[in-house]
From Swiss-Prot:
SMART domains: IG (SM00409), IGc2 (SM00408). The gene is CD22. Disulfide bonds join C161-C219, C265-C309, C353-C396, C442-C484, C529-C571, C616-C659. One of its GO terms (molecular function) is sialic acid binding. The chain crosses the membrane at residues 688-708. Most highly expressed siglec (sialic acid-binding immunoglobulin-like lectin) on B-cells that plays a role in various aspects of B-cell biology including differentiation, antigen presentation, and trafficking to bone marrow. Binds to alpha 2,6-linked sialic acid residues of surface molecules such as CD22 itself, CD45 and IgM in a cis configuration. Can also bind to ligands on other cells as an adhesion molecule in a trans configuration. This is B-cell receptor CD22. The keyword Nucleus does not apply.
Length: 847
């Protein structure tokens, strides 16, 4: 029964713990590391079903008290509803909240802080104690260097330096060193302050070489000021192929035949250790040579060559630099090689002495039929012209610094002479000109054996009309050489004969010397007449432009080129054989527009209503690309083509026009050209009709007026005679006054106006009444008592016609005021007249 008690209590506690743990969930690093004087940053998060957190207590090494059912220990931090109670040192800061963040910071941290930190969390419904391990050392603990499993030379690797520490309030840095010297490669440093891990890491990438093998790499922990705190070191294990060097005895690797040579393959470094050794000569492996030392006893000349050693390990083979071994020996027995054998008399023969030796022979001795040939000490003996006495046995002896070789078997020279004194004869008279037919014959003095055939060179499609005769039709130009050979068993070639064909100059062409670019008007221009060859070489030059001879020099110069110099040029080169002309070469001169003028179609006088085309003609190269038109007021017209078309043309278009042309070189403008637009017959007819009608109407009115006036006068005259009254009538005609013609202005153009005014003016004079009788009027005395309603009047009239031309643009020769003045004075009978005011009435009749 007593045994069941503790187990039952344990089960109850486990159940309670399990029930509480289901309500709480924490995440934080399991263990945190620091050192005396540093700080600790504890990232922490939690999740509780009851988020109403009432208190938070941070214990150091907490222990559960069964009696009080509470935890005992040093309280580093406490937070309750009543407020915060800071620790004595005020080192602990709670950086979280009452929701999910339980992050803490201890700064500074001490060694006695090591142990367990207990986070006591209490809510209304649950409690929980979360434990965190803290490890604080007296001194800064070293970082840890992590290397890849294997490092090979020239392969990039990453070195990692890891420190299980990071705190926001305590900055640190990690420094890489190689053999105590800071490494040049840039390292990448990163930190982690998460609920999973807290660390500072530095990664360094570099490509190790075999020389780095065994070197010490250090990762040094420093504070913010660069002060050393701790470090970690590792030794690099760089896998590499064997590194080799050959040592030769003698050191210059030059020995004489029969001497010994020792070559030692020194392995300066190999990781891992080498396993196989081999030697190579000229790239081929030497058999049974698998040690680091190669001994060559009594070397021969065949052992000369390039030697190297090859040593392999698990990484691969390593090969040393090549050593060239030279084995020196005296010349071996000589042999003679005869070139061009058998030899023909007159030909050339070359003898070559061949003997193997190292170093090469420096002196040779030649023998002819056992007799030393004086002055022949070279490797080759050349006889330019073999004669019959040159036949026989030839041998030689070679010599170098090691000794003199032996004379080998001789070589026999068999001289069989071909036909002697073979000559090629040109049958034609000289000189030979291009296109001639040339006949050559092959002659000789003697031959043994007899001549059986002839050969010619060079070969061509030539004709051999007979044995030993060659005929060349239409011989070509150039320094052609012909040689013939008279052949028996061998051929004997005659000395080549140059046909020396003369020809006219060839490949004549015109070449521009300057300028190198486009030719503009005013440039200095030089043309060169070139040709490839001429025979004879004495030549003359002629320049021609458009069929006209210009000069007789090889170069044609223009100090200041003008557009008139443009054209087709060709040059002629002649010698005593003939002349050759070049292809026509066009000289193009670029210049601004010039000689501009305005041409008018159909002419400079155009009837209104028709069409008129103004064309801006110019001389330019390149052609005009832009035209501008201007009127007589120098106003630019909105036309930019070469032709200005006016359709239909009007009288208002009359005036002066000019144009301006522009190209890539410059611009130019034309002089003024006047366009006159005159009236059409229809317009003139209409205006003449209107003018004639107006004049006719005025004339009719004037005639009618005169007739009416005369009738009125007769009527008044008759009434006066009947009334025995005295009256006087008279006409007054104005004196014609010559006036200066109207000035003709520049714009005296217009239409006839038929409505010009003619005027007839009337005037009436009234006299006061009088009873004084007139003397001399006895015949009319019975009429002296006029009726009381009659009054004395004088009627004065003027008929005035204004002189004017029929048309407004036709001015009369003179202008004058001409009028017919008619006046009639009537004196009525004497009698009592009523008092009346004297007055003058004017009447003006206009028509």
């Amino acid at each position: 029964m007593h045994l069941l008690g503790p187990w039952l209590l344990l089960l109850v506690l486990e159940y309670l713990a399990f029930s509480d743990s289901s309500k709480w969930a924490f995440e934080h690093p399991e263990t945190l590391y620091a050192w005396e004087g540093a700080c600790v940053w504890i990232p922490c998060t939690y999740r509780a079903l009851d988020r109403d957190l009432e208190s938070f207590i941070l214990f150091h090494n907490p222990e559960y008290n069964k009696n009080t059912s509470k935890f005992d220990g040093t309280r580093l931090y406490e937070s309750t509803k009543d407020g915060k109670v800071p620790s004595e040192q005020k080192r602990v800061q709670f950086l979280g909240d009452k929701n999910k963040n339980c992050t803490l910071s201890i700064h500074p941290v001490h060694v006695n802080d090591s142990g367990q930190l207990g986070l006591r969390m209490e809510s209304k419904t649950a409690k929980w104690m979360e434990r965190i391990h803290l490890n604080v050392s007296e001194r800064p603990f070293p970082p840890h260097i992590q290397l890849p499993p294997e490092i090979q030379e020239s392969q990039e690797v990453t070195l990692t330096c890891l420190l299980n520490f990071s705190c926001y309030g305590y900055p640190i840095q990690l420094q890489w060193l190689l053999e105590g010297v800071p490494m040049r490669q840039a390292a990448v440093t990163s930190t982690s302050l998460t609920i999973k891990s807290v660390f500072t890491r530095s990664e360094l990438k570099f490509s190790p070489q075999w020389s780095h093998h065994g070197k010490i790499v250090t990762c040094q922990l420093q504070d913010a000021d660069g002060k050393f705190l701790s470090n970690d070191t590792v030794q690099l294990n760089v896998k590499h192929t064997p590194k080799l060097e050959i040592k030769v005895t003698p050191s210059d690797a030059i020995v004489r035949e029969g001497e010994s040579v020792t070559m030692t393959c020194e392995v300066s470094s190999s990781n891992p250790e080498y396993t196989t050794i081999s030697w190579l000569k000229d790239g081929t492996s030497l058999k049974k040579q698998n040690t680091l030392m190669l001994n060559l006893h009594e070397v021969t000349k065949d052992q000369s060559g390039k030697y190297c050693c090859q040593v392999s390990n698990d990484v691969g083979p390593g090969r040393s630099a090549e050593v060239f071994l030279q084995v020196q020996y005296a010349p071996e027995p000589s042999t003679v090689q005869i070139l061009h054998s058998p030899a023909v008399e007159g030909s050339q023969v070359e003898f070559l002495c061949m003997s193997l030796a190292n170093p090469l022979p420096t002196n040779y001795t030649w023998y002819h039929n056992g007799k030393e040939m004086q002055g022949r000490t070279e490797e080759k003996v050349h006889i330019p012209k073999i004669l019959p006495w040159h036949a026989g046995t030839y041998s030689c002896v070679a010599e170098n610094i090691l000794g003199t070789g032996q004379r080998g078997p001789g070589a026999e020279l068999d001289v069989q002479y071909p036909p002697k004194k073979v000559t090629t004869v040109i049958q034609n008279p000289t000189p030979i000109r291009e296109g001639d037919t040339v006949t050559l014959s092959c002659n000789y003095n003697s031959s043994n054996p007899s001549v059986t055939r002839y050969e010619w060179k060079p070969h061509g499609a030539w004709e051999e009309p007979s044995l030993g005769v060659l005929k060349i039709q239409n011989v070509g130009w150039g320094n052609t050489t012909i040689a013939c050979a008279a052949c028996n068993s061998w051929c004997s070639w005659a000395s080549p004969v140059a046909l020396n064909v003369q020809y006219a100059p060839r490949d004549v062409r015109v070449r521009k010397i300057k300028p190198l670019s486009e030719i503009h008007s005013g440039n200095s221009v030089s043309l060169q007449c070139d040709f490839s060859s001429s025979h004879p070489k004495e030549v003359q030059f002629f320049w021609e432009k458009n069929g006209r001879l210009l000069g007789k020099e090889s170069r044609l110069n223009f100090d200041s080129i003008s557009p008139e110099d443009a054209g087709s040029y060709s040059c002629w080169v002649n010698n005593s054989i003939g002349q050759t002309a070049s292809k026509a070469w066009t000289l193009e001169v670029l210049y601004a527009p010039r000689r501009l003028r305005v041409s008018m179609s159909p002419g400079d006088q155009v009837m209104e209503g028709k069409s008129a085309t103004l064309t801006c003609e110019s001389d330019a190269n390149p052609p005009v690309s832009h035209y501008t038109w201007f009127d007589w007021n120098n106003q630019s017209l909105p036309y930019h083509s070469q032709k200005l078309r006016l359709e239909p043309v009007k009288v208002q278009h009359s005036g002066a026009y000019w144009c301006q042309g522009t190209n890539s070189v410059g611009k130019g403008h034309s002089p003024l050209s006047t366009l006159t637009v005159y009236y059409s017959p229809e317009t003139i007819g209409r205006r003449v009709a209107v003018g004639f009608g107006s004049c006719l109407a005025i004339l009719i009115l004037a005639i009618c007026g005169l007739k009416l006036q005369r009738r009125w006068k007769r009527t008044q005259s008759q009434q006066g005679l009947q009334e025995n009254s005295s009256g006087q009538s008279f006409f007054v005609r104005n004196k014609k006054v010559r006036r200066a013609p109207l000035s003709e202005g520049p714009h005296s153009l217009g239409c006839y106006n038929p409505m010009m005014e003619d005027g007839i003016s009337y005037t009436t004079l009234r006299f006061p009444e009088t009873n004084i009788p007139r003397t001399g009027d006895a015949e009319t005395s019975e009429m002296q008592s006029p009726p009381p309603d009659c009054d004395d009047t004088v009627t004065y009239s003027v008929l005035h016609k204004r002189q004017m031309g029929d048309y407004e643009n036709v001015i009369p020769d003179f202008s004058e005021d001409e009028g017919i003045h008619y006046s009639e004075l009537i004196q009525f009978g004497v009698g009592e007249r009523p008092q009346a005011q004297e007055n003058v009435d004017y009447v003006i009749l206009k028509h």
